[in-house]
Amino acid sequence: MEEFVGLREGSSGNPVTLQELWGPCPRIRRGIRGGLEWLKQKLFRLGEDWYFLMTLGVLMALVSCAMDLAVESVVRAHQWLYREIGDSHLLRYLSWTVYPVALVSFSSGFSQSITPSSGGSGIPEVKTMLAGVVLEDYLDIKNFGAKVVGLSCTLACGSTLFLGKVGPFVHLSVMMAAYLGRVRTTTIGEPENKSKQNEMLVAAAAVGVATVFAAPFSGVLFSIEVMSSHFSVWDYWRGFFAATCGAFMFRLLAVFNSEQETITSLYKTSFRVDVPFDLPEIFFFVALGGLCGILGSAYLFCQRIFFGFIRNNRFSSKLLATSKPVYSALATLVLASITYPPSAGRFLASRLSMKQHLDSLFDNHSWALMTQNSSPPWPEELDPQHLWWEWYHPRFTIFGTLAFFLVMKFWMLILATTIPMPAGYFMPIFVYGAAIGRLFGETLSFIFPEGIVAGGITNPIMPGGYALAGAAAFSGAVTHTISTALLAFEVTGQIVHALPVLMAVLAANAIAQSCQPSFYDGTVIVKKLPYLPRILGRNIGSHRVRVEHFMNHSITTLAKDMPLEEVVKVVTSTDVAKYPLVESTESQILVGIVRRAQLVQALKAEPPSWAPGHQQCLQDILAAGCPTEPVTLKLSPETSLHEAHNLFELLNLHSLFVTSRGRAVGCVSWVEMKKAISNLTNPPAPK
């Protein structure tokens, strides 16, 4: 039914609806409508990417907060069950062990049944995808649901497994960004843009870290260091915007949930601000960094060896292939039995959560000095006001419990990384590093009970500062990152130890990077994911090695004047994804690239008159509509390995053709690059 229209009195004759004419306050409503249209026009001038990034940050903060609330409820239920079940050691042992075993079995079985790619950290796979490799199902939305459920069960196990959520949240954020990107392209009808999708995934990786620690700065820098070797400034801005939105919403939700009175740091500390450390202590911080570098290299070596042993052992490999939940349950039973509080768990502070571990380890008081003349009791129930009591035993003392914690957690963390379920491995090594620093600081405070004299002034040593440096240094050594120093400052809200912590992280990285690949690179190697190794150092001769020394000379070219029967023979006898297109068989001048799939489709679409036997050539197929691609990049035989490697990393390339005076003479792919780099680092023995 058509609406009645009228003419507004004194108007120029433009028709208006009677509803608008007789409605209340027509001028105000028209002004509001015009203002909204103006605001919409101004907002969308910025581009929809910024709204996309803000939505991504807010959604991931909601997921992180909801997961924390759900996990906290399950952990409280476990604690209540353990506390109320009675004094029977058997029942208490069963309540302590069966609970995490059931959760881990469900986590492993559920995630693996939905999609096998949901297990593990996810960062190695994301790193591989950002390098341009297509991994099926890793960005599927069903993978998102499986990983959320599995990770929630993993975190609900508490200190028995001692695992975190940083890596999985990076993977979850990337999956959410990919899904939102697909929704956007479907809604506005724009074609899929791989370059734009990659930009969003890079920003999403920063959001994953920011929504776990509420640390936008270190989230962006950590994602840069872990995910890529070259980074665009344009992605830098996007990453900071999305990470800030996610971190702000994450802490805002904590305020709304009455967890905090206002937006504050994640872990509370009370370090001295006036004189946090004396100048001679710089040497001890550097020594702590060196120790963390050595222990980090040992951890990476043992983790990779043990992972290979589990995969090659007949019993464990069969379990992992056929009964992943059974292997997960057995490994969890071992870990839960060790952490049972009345037994060895008494010396591992197993009643503390990971957050409480850090809160206690960052305490600025010296436990060794506090327990010299008095022995604090070990309470039947956990005392939130005296968390450090969990680290004390009258026979073992503080030094014994910390040392026992480091020895046991070293192999327990390695065992936990082999369980096929969604889990993060950054937070455990962060806590482990804090324990290293705490033991180092307690030792110094015991040796220098009055402090170190500098400039006639004596200030007591703060072991909490060394715990902070140890957390940043050890986690930085394992992941080969420097941003862990900034992360330590953001999560504690303290920057008074900026210089010594940074020096410790640099010392740890200098040792670890020269000995072992990072945790994520090692996982890529063990899982046999496609990767391009980095060229370490500047003095290994990468500038002297030329492309002509390692390129693949045996390439199959397609000439425009090649008969169709020859083209068919080439296509059926090879399985390469693309062929170099040359001007003629004689000249071999490279003029383009032909995709195998498109060429096969064009050959199948030809009429019978084009069958083999007729003197038709490839040029006719190309003229009939078979698409070709221009050669935008190519290498020269004189190009150095160093230049070629930088080009591959910068543009996420997988292969390039090599031309000499325009003639196609070879190609270089990741296979040839890996072999050339391997020959530089480990020269073959002379024949």
Swiss-Prot record:
Record has Protease as a keyword: no
Annotated control of activity: Activated by extracellular Ca(2+) and inhibited by extracellular acidic pH.
Effect of residue 560 to M: In BARTS3; decreases channel conductance
Binding site for chloride: 121, 426
Glycosylation sites: 193
Highest rank taxon of the organism: Eukaryota
CBS domain: residues covered: 551-609, 626-684
Name under which the protein is recorded: Chloride channel protein ClC-Kb
Organism: Homo sapiens
Lineage: Eukaryota, Metazoa, Chordata, Craniata, Vertebrata
Primary gene name: CLCNKB
